[in-house]
A protein has these predicted regions:
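Extended alpha-helical coiled-coil "stalk/arm" regions
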Residues: 1-6, 181-202
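Hinge-like oligomerization/junction regions that interrupt long coiled-coil arms in large cytoskeletal
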Residues: 2-184
Length: 202
């Protein structure tokens, strides 16, 4: 977010032209149970800045000409693109089928990207996982042919780490809950400190 803000400020560009892919993708409420799995599969794409072709050269020059202090991945969005439509499938849902894409100029581009980035079959167990080249379990185990990945650095249902969608309500609620827990810990520790200080004075 900071890099986008600085980029648009320095180049005098409208921030509304530059979206992170994840801001334009939401998991359909009817499939909310799969939110964590979707976040795991799509996180790299979700954190990708979409750069319109018309601004691509200036943005590349700006990025190359400075130390960003962070990682930035950006995709050039062609002015005209042959739209890839995800193939219809039989025998179970694929990840792209449970996603809602924000209407607008980037909708076709996002749909095309999801055609190959979100073609994972949604499977309920390892037996099903073994039957599909690309699949993901509810617990977040991803399969891409022979490659398997499960990133459990954070719980699959931990909304603090979610990046899909424009609304931050779930993330804010999770962070507020964590803050309340930490404040409780601080209060308890302060009470213990006060008791120890009082004992020393006796």
């Amino acid at each position: 977010m900071r890099v986008r803000d600085e980029l648009c400020r320095d180049l005098k560009l409208n921030e509304s032209e530059f979206a992170f892919a994840g801001e334009l993708i939401e998991v359909n409420e009817g499939h909310a149970a799969w939110r964590g799995a979707a976040e795991r599969v799509l996180r790299p794409f979700a954190l990708t800045l979409l750069v319109p072709q018309i601004h691509y050269l200036r943005v590349s020059q700006w990025v190359n000409g400075r130390h960003l202090g962070t990682k930035l991945v950006y995709l050039r969005v062609p002015e005209r693109r042959v739209r890839s439509v995800p193939a219809q499938t039989h025998g179970g849902l694929r990840l792209w089928q449970i996603l809602d894409i924000e209407p607008g100029t980037l909708q076709g581009f996002i749909t095309g990207e999801l055609a190959h980035r979100a073609e994972h079959r949604l499977v309920n167990d390892l037996a099903e996982l073994e039957h599909h080249d690309r699949a993901v379990t509810l617990e977040g185990l991803m399969r891409d042919r022979n490659r398997h990945e499960k990133d459990d650095r954070h719980r699959v249902d931990d909304a603090r780490w979610w990046v899909l969608g424009r609304s931050n309500e779930r993330k804010i609620a999770a962070l507020q809950c964590e803050l309340a827990e930490l404040q409780g810990v601080v209060t308890r520790l302060q009470t213990e400190i006060d008791q120890l200080v009082a004992q020393d004075r006796e």
